[in-house]
Every structure is written in structure tokens, then in C-alpha cells.
């Protein structure tokens, strides 16, 4: 049995993860939660801070906000247990901190836990270099009106994957305004926030005579929870410090 402490247990994703762990993952048990809201109805104890947790566990799973990062890393270092980061909105300084921390603990990070998005991300590694010469590349990401970070972590993941796959130097733009002709080396990430959109990501390869679109639409938060719980199963026995991702969980390398 994989014993998990869930940071952000009282939020929307925390609720979905708790339910799926109970109904579809018989080998995973949420043994405790961490959240500012300690009054949520959960079948496990909820603590306000990581350092308050006194429960034995195998994996610490974070699905909250970027500002929880340092306290979670310190707790994982103290307990010598793997940490899974599923939050987004990290700053450049945060990412550097994550990189350094992975030298001390087994640290998993993914901007999107969906199996589909990770397949799309790997597909882009092959597609972008083939199409770049004759196609302009644009991205559109759409999310609900409560999402606080923009562009989404997933959009940045896809954009950086495209950049890294190309021999040519490109530059990222975030939205467009004013009067200016599009430059060939631009990759623009456009953001939409509205309603209850769970998460849509669209990569557009626009040529003179044809347009290729690669789309992913999340129609249920279950897809993120399933990926997170699979990551918990994968990371439970990891003792070696290092960086891990959904590519490791899904064994993607094509």
C-alpha cells in the first residue's frame, strides 16, 4: 500500500484525488492532508502546515499553489521521502530551487499530469522540427476564470518543448498587441480565461496552403488526478535523489 500525504487536499483537485484514490486505486491510501482549510470533510486528518504532520507516509503529493514550494521541500528533506509537485506558476527562482533540491531528494515535477498532454508534448518533439521551416507556430491555452497564473504551466511546457526541439533560435511572445509584422522566429502563446473551462491547449502550425492543429481538451479533472496517483505509485519506492517526470511514469521516449 502506497501511503500519501496530499497537500491542497481541501481544493477542487484535492477532492477529486481523494475520491479516485478511494474508488479506483486500491494500492494507494491518502493517510493525511495539508491545507489552510482544516475543516473539510475527508476520511483522514488534515494539518495546517507540513511540519504539523506526524503521520507515517511514502510520498508527499502537492496539488496546490507555487507559494507552498519551500515548506514542502524542507519537509521532504527532513523525512527523506519523495516529493511530487503538480502545481504551476513557479518563478524562475522557484525552478532553480527545484533543480537544486532534486540533488537531495527524489523530486517529481510535471506542469500537467494528464496522459494525453504528455503524449502531445512528446509528439511535438518530432513534429516541430519537420514543420518549422514552412509553418508559423502559435499556441492558445484556455482555462477557467479562477486560474491565477498565465500563461498556464502546460502552455509553457509545450512552447519550451518546441523551442528545444528546433536548431533555430526562437523567441516566445505572450499575446499580441499593436502594429507589427510577425517575425519568422516568433512562437506566440495566447491566453483565454473564462467560465469553467478545465483546460484546453491548442498548438497551431499555420502554412500558406494548410493548417495543422494539435489539440488537447480536458473534460474532467479526473485525468489530472489519475496521472497524479500513477505518479505516487511510481515514486513510492524511489530513494535516489534526482528529477522525475511523467515521461518516466509513462515510459515515453519517442
Curated annotation (Swiss-Prot):
The keyword Glycosyltransferase does not apply. It catalyses: (S)-2,3,4,5-tetrahydrodipicolinate + NAD(+) + H2O = (2S,4S)-4-hydroxy-2,3,4,5-tetrahydrodipicolinate + NADH + H(+); (S)-2,3,4,5-tetrahydrodipicolinate + NADP(+) + H2O = (2S,4S)-4-hydroxy-2,3,4,5-tetrahydrodipicolinate + NADPH + H(+). CDD domains: DHDPR_N. (S)-2,3,4,5-tetrahydrodipicolinate binds at residues 144, 153-154. InterPro entries: DapB_C, DapB_N, DapB_N_CS, DHDPR_bac, NAD(P)-bd_dom_sf. Pathway: Amino-acid biosynthesis; L-lysine biosynthesis via DAP pathway; (S)-tetrahydrodipicolinate from L-aspartate: step 4/4. The active site is at 143 (proton donor/acceptor), 147 (proton donor). It is an enzyme of class 1 (oxidoreductase). Its EC number is 1.17.1.8. Keywords: Amino-acid biosynthesis, Cytoplasm, Diaminopimelate biosynthesis, Lysine biosynthesis, NAD, NADP, Oxidoreductase. It is found in: Cytoplasm. One of its GO terms (molecular function) is NAD binding. SUPFAM superfamilies: Glyceraldehyde-3-phosphate dehydrogenase-like, C-terminal domain, NAD(P)-binding Rossmann-fold domains. Catalyzes the conversion of 4-hydroxy-tetrahydrodipicolinate (HTPA) to tetrahydrodipicolinate. PANTHER family: 4-HYDROXY-TETRAHYDRODIPICOLINATE REDUCTASE, DIHYDRODIPICOLINATE REDUCTASE. Belongs to the DapB family. This is 4-hydroxy-tetrahydrodipicolinate reductase. It comes from Clostridium perfringens (strain ATCC 13124 / DSM 756 / JCM 1290 / NCIMB 6125 / NCTC 8237 / Type A).
Amino acid at each position: 500500500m502506497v501511503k500519501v500525504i496530499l497537500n491542497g487536499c481541501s481544493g477542487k483537485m484535492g477532492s477529486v484525488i481523494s475520491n479516485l484514490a478511494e474508488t479506483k486505486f486500491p494500492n494507494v491510501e491518502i493517510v493525511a492532508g495539508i491545507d489552510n482549510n482544516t475543516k473539510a470533510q475527508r476520511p483522514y486528518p488534515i494539518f495546517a502546515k507540513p511540519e504539523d504532520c506526524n503521520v507515517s507516509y511514502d510520498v508527499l503529493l502537492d496539488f496546490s499553489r507555487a507559494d507552498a514550494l519551500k515548506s514542502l521541500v524542507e519537509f521532504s528533506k527532513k523525512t527523506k521521502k519523495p516529493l511530487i509537485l503538480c502545481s504551476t506558476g513557479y518563478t524562475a527562482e522557484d525552478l532553480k530551487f527545484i533543480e537544486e533540491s532534486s540533488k537531495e531528494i527524489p523530486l517529481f515535477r510535471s506542469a500537467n499530469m494528464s496522459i494525453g498532454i504528455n503524449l502531445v508534448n512528446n509528439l511535438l518533439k518530432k513534429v516541430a522540427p519537420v514543420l518549422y521551416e514552412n509553418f508559423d507556430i502559435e499556441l492558445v491555452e484556455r482555462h477557467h476564470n479562477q486560474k491565477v497564473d498565465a500563461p498556464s504551466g502546460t502552455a509553457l511546457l509545450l512552447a519550451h518543448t518546441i523551442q528545444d526541439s528546433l536548431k533555430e533560435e526562437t523567441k516566445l511572445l505572450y499575446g499580441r498587441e499593436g502594429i507589427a509584422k510577425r517575425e519568422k522566429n516568433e512562437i506566440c502563446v495566447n491566453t483565454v480565461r473564462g467560465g469553467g473551462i478545465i483546460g484546453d491547449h491548442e498548438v497551431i502550425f499555420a502554412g500558406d496552403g494548410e493548417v495543422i492543429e494539435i489539440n488537447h481538451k480536458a473534460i474532467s479533472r479526473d485525468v489530472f488526478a489519475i496521472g497524479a496517483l500513477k505518479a505516487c505509485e511510481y515514486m513510492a519506492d524511489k530513494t535516489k535523489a534526482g528529477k522525475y517526470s511523467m515521461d518516466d511514469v509513462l515510459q515515453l521516449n519517442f
